[in-house]
A protein has these predicted regions:
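Bacterial N-terminal signal peptides
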Residues: 9-23
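Metal-dependent amide/peptide-bond hydrolase catalytic core
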Residues: 29, 204-465, 471, 477-481
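Acidic/His- and Gly-rich active-site-bordering loop/insert found
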Residues: 29-136, 155-164, 342
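Solvent-exposed loop/turn segments at secondary-structure junctions
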Residues: 51-53, 85, 96-99, 109-113, ...
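Acidic/histidine-rich catalytic neighborhood of metal-dependent amide-processing enzymes
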Residues: 132-133, 139-217
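Solvent-exposed, acidic/flexible segments
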Residues: 31-39, 50-61, 85, 138-141, ...
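N-terminal secretory signal peptides that target proteins for export/translocation
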Residues: 1-7
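Sec-exported extracytoplasmic/periplasmic mature domains
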Residues: 43-50, 65-74, 150-157, 187-194, ...
Length: 481
């Protein structure tokens, strides 16, 4: 899941009154053979530990590879590889007629850590209970991986011939670690994954309120993730002889300045359309404020009022926040070292290095050193100049297909292009010039988002509706009915 992403909730408050629909149907339109296949793939993936600490993405990749070989895919259309033997990625090319450029589907196989003592069930056992599937990865994102595998196998079994190649990449280390699979493939095997555009089931999806579909979100852009290490060093000394030059005080002062700093207000094409749409659904002062921020000259007072909502604030601004702190080495000694981590979510169009330089200006203290920390935990004096590109125009073919499917499966729920305030593997494909969209048919209650958390779970019928959705979507985008 996009790092730090909050599934749903961004549009829910305004839509509840206007777009409530009948509860979800009891069963998705998926035959029993497909249900069994999807169940078995999902169970197999959940029960393969793919955490960074002790797990193996390679084991999951090989399990998928074997299923695809058994379904009749040629080994010549597969690639298994990566930077080390635990982090091998799998790429499959489902060959079409070549009438159109390929579509790339990406799904990460790794999951965040989970401790057995924190859960009521074993996080690495696939448990069915009370209408839910439990297990680490049921929401993030082995559900999406299982759906992609199921879709590929069923299409192959039916002899389906798409009008374009369908490329699917199952990858490592979206959640962290040193070997991000999408980044590695872009840098080392771009020819295997080059496509017109990218669909990432790790974003988007249907927001539910008490079983009723509120909206179908499509992640049309996202923020850039960046960690920065703040360091202050000092000779230290005995605590009975304090001096003003204290490493902790310098660091604390810098963090207080960050606390009171607001990055500039910015809207892009996606967020402008989002807030403009939202203004027609809200009422009173909130509606007026939403209209005011989408004008050619946005109203500063309206921006300030709307920024009190953390989700809207994050969509309007780059945000940086202190997330970790450590200092000192003894209770009776002046600190020789004070460190903090500042986590930033950066609006499209700005680079990691640009924000590092901005932090230096905010802190305004030469004793505070600001370094960039990559996903592997490695620290660098300078950050990459990589930036999340401004969102391209929405793909009309894709949006039309999603609109039609949503109208049929969740009548009345609007399709809402959004900006994810987190970051996913789409950041790498977007940067490589392949427009990337978070698209999912999974429906989750807005108050039951458990990705990365305790007792992660997914409603059983939501999973099978997701299977149904992607099977139909792939056909619609590749020449099928």
């Amino acid at each position: 899941m996009p790092k730090g992403a909050f599934r749903g909730g961004l549009f829910v408050g305004a839509l509840l009154g206007a777009f409530l629909t009948p509860p979800l149907a009891t069963h998705a339109q998926v035959d029993e053979q497909t249900r069994k296949l999807a169940h078995d793939v999902f169970q197999q993936l959940i029960e393969i530990n793919t955490t960074d600490s002790v797990g193996s993405v390679t084991a999951a990749s090989k399990a998928i590879q074997q299923r695809l070989l058994d379904a009749g895919f040629s080994p010549n259309d597969m690639y298994l590889g990566g930077p080390n033997d635990r982090k091998e990625n799998l790429v499959l090319r489902y060959r079409g007629t070549g009438q159109k450029k390929p579509i790339l589907f990406i799904g990460h196989l790794d999951v965040v850590e989970a401790r057995r003592e924190d859960w009521t069930t074993d996080p690495f056992k696939f448990v069915e209970k009370d209408g839910y599937y439990y297990g680490r990865g049921t929401q993030d994102m082995k559900d999406g991986d299982a759906i992609l595998v199921t879709t590929l196998i069923r299409l192959k079994q039916e002899g389906y011939k798409p009008d374009r190649d369908l490329i699917v990449a199952f990858t490592a280390d979206e959640e962290g670690g040193k070997s991000n699979g999408v980044d590695w493939l872009v840098k080392n095997h771009r020819e295997l994954i080059d496509a017109e555009y990218v669909l990432n089931p790790d974003g988007g999806g249907v927001d539910l309120d008490r079983g009723k579909a509120v909206s179908m979100d499509v992640d049309a852009t996202e923020k850039l993730y960046g960690d920065y290490q703040l360091t202050v060093t000092n000779p230290g000394g005995h605590s009975s002889l304090p001096v003003p030059d204290n490493a902790i005080y310098h660091l604390a002062g810098a963090l207080v300045r960050l606390q009171h700093f607001q990055f500039p207000f910015e809207l892009n094409a996606v967020t402008h359309a989002y807030f403009e749409r939202l203004s027609t659904l809200e009422t009173g002062q909130k509606s007026a404020d939403l209209k005011a921020i989408t004008q050619p000259t946005p109203d500063p007072a309206a921006i300030e009022r709307l920024s009190q909502n953390p989700e809207w604030n994050s969509m309007m601004h780059t945000t940086c926040v202190a997330t970790r702190l450590q200092a000192g080495h003894a209770n009776n000694a002046l600190p020789q070292l004070a460190e903090a981590n500042v986590n930033c979510r950066i609006l499209p169009g700005h680079s990691l290095e640009e924000i590092r330089q901005q932090l230096i200006k905010i802190f305004d203290d030469p004793k505070v050193t600001v370094r960039y920390v990559n996903d592997a935990g490695e620290v660098f004096d300078k950050a990459p100049d990589r930036k999340q590109l401004p969102p391209p125009p929405l793909n009309p073919e894709l949006m039309s297909a999603i609109e039609k499917l949503t109208a049929a499966m969740w009548p009345g729920a609007p399709v809402i292009p959004t900006m994810s305030t987190g970051a996913s593997d789409s950041v790498y494909t977007n940067a490589a010039g392949m427009p990337s969209y978070g698209v999912s048919g999974i429906a989750i209650e807005t108050n039951d988002v458990r990705a990365h958390g305790q007792d992660e779970r997914l409603p059983i019928e939501s999973f099978y509706r997701g299977v149904d959705f992607y099977s139909k979507l792939v056909r619609m985008l590749s020449g099928g009915a």
